[in-house]
């Protein structure tokens, strides 16, 4: 199941990169707004639950919680 999820996410990233490189960006304002909203998302503090390391401020997730760096 994990392998299938990784393959799916990789395919989505490749498709997005290919579309952007061809200049087929239809909603430029929406895309830039989305980019800035992603930049302002907050990370999960230590001792709080996580699933992946990128969620944690310290980038250290040992399930089920974030650890301080």
Swiss-Prot record:
GO MF: ion channel inhibitor activity; toxin activity
Segments forming a coiled coil: none
Propeptide residue intervals: 18-40
Chief subcellular location: secreted
Keyword Signal among UniProt keywords: yes
Tissue and organ expression note: Expressed by the venom duct.
GO cellular component, one term: extracellular region
Annotated S-S bridges: 43-57, 50-61, 56-66
Free-text note on domains in this protein's UniProt record: The presence of a 'disulfide through disulfide knot' structurally defines this protein as a knottin. The cysteine framework is VI/VII (C-C-CC-C-C).
Family to which the UniProt record says this protein belongs: Belongs to the conotoxin O1 superfamily.
Record protein name field: Conotoxin AbVIE
Organism this protein belongs to: Conus abbreviatus (Abbreviated cone)
